[in-house]
UniProtKB/Swiss-Prot annotation:
It comes from Herminiimonas arsenicoxydans. Its EC number is 2.7.2.8. One of its GO terms (cellular component) is cytoplasm. The record marks K35, K254 as: Transition state stabilizer. Catalyzes the ATP-dependent phosphorylation of N-acetyl-L-glutamate. Pathway: Amino-acid biosynthesis; L-arginine biosynthesis; N(2)-acetyl-L-ornithine from L-glutamate: step 2/4. Keywords: Amino-acid biosynthesis, Arginine biosynthesis, ATP-binding, Cytoplasm, Kinase, Nucleotide-binding, Transferase. This is Acetylglutamate kinase.
Length: 297
């Protein structure tokens, strides 16, 4: 879909709008949670098109909520201080120094970049971390050691979500703002925790009873071992792919969170290619099959 409608004929413009109309009606007033990450966050062209897409969804009556990642930005910041990112099962090992970097990169640089772009194009975005309004209460994660059943790995200040308080998000939605959420949780003692953005997006979608959860990635969707795109995955198929290692690394928390959201009542969960310009609009406002749909059954 080309965002610049001035370069196509009036007939094609009308066709594009007509195709979107049923979806605008269907999703009017509904919450759409978007996990925003990958190339869509780092390439200037994609950053600008994403901001405009989110505004359009808001203008036609939907309630977009954006949960952003920022892995490449964190890695770049760590390199500047002589540190290298290390991951276990898709989770970043987060010592005290790394946690400080995560906080100022996600809650500062990355979040503000998204907010400013959306506001630049006429939207009204507000940035949040888990501390704002008690949004995300977290505790230290005890990661199971897969090589030693019954034992756990200490990966630092990485958090599990204890509770989501959606009041601040709902208040912003009621006042026509677009919430932009950084995946940082806080413990009862005020300790900050780094939480995987896919996990936060899934839980936010569940608590808000979202109509859709859309996860933007750097691949076309979930692929089999031969690299073929799988357009539709059931819970049983996902379990089999976990067992045989088809799904591994950073895809583990992504698929687990997507499946949990589907099982918890989010109507549709999609993993889409964020490298494609306007992929968000293609998913929400057209009939085009796109990425991978996750089913709870």
């Amino acid at each position: 879909m080309n965002a610049d409608l001035t370069v196509v004929s009036p007939q094609i413009q009308a066709q594009i709008l007509a195709e979107a109309l049923p979806y605008i009606r269907k999703f009017h007033g509904k919450t759409i949670v978007v996990k925003y990450g990958g190339n869509a966050m780092t390439e200037e062209r994609l950053k600008h098109s994403f901001a405009r897409d989110v505004i359009l969804l808001k203008l036609v009556g939907m309630n977009p909520v954006v949960v952003h990642g920022g892995g490449p930005q964190i890695d770049n910041a760590l390199k500047k201080i002589g540190k290298q990112g290390t991951f276990i099962q898709g989770m970043r090992i987060t010592d005290e120094e790394t946690m400080e970097v995560v906080e100022w990169v996600l809650g500062g640089e990355v979040q503000q970049d998204i907010v400013m772009l959306i506001n630049h194009y006429g939207g009204q975005a507000v940035g949040l971390t888990g501390k704002d309004g008690g949004l995300i209460r977290a505790r230290k994660m005890n990661m199971p050691d897969r090589e030693n059943p019954g034992k756990f790995l200490d990966i630092g200040f990485v958090g599990d979500i204890e509770a989501i308080n959606p009041a601040v998000v709902k208040a912003l939605q009621d006042d026509a703002f677009i919430p932009i959420i950084s995946p940082i949780g806080f413990g009862d003692d005020g300790q900050a925790y780094n939480i995987n953005a896919d996990v936060v997006a899934g839980k936010i979608a569940e608590i808000l009873r979202a109509e859709k959860l859309i996860m933007m990635t750097n691949i076309a969707g979930v692929q089999d071992k031969q690299g073929n795109l799988l357009t539709d995955l059931s819970a049983r198929e996902i379990d089999e792919m976990f067992e045989d290692g088809t799904i591994s690394g950073g895809m583990l928390p992504k698929i687990s969170s997507a499946l949990d959201a589907a099982k918890s009542g989010v109507n549709t969960v999609h993993i889409i290619d964020g490298r494609i310009e306007h992929s968000l609009l293609l998913e929400v406002l057209t009939e085009q099959a796109f990425g991978t749909m996750i089913r709870s059954h």
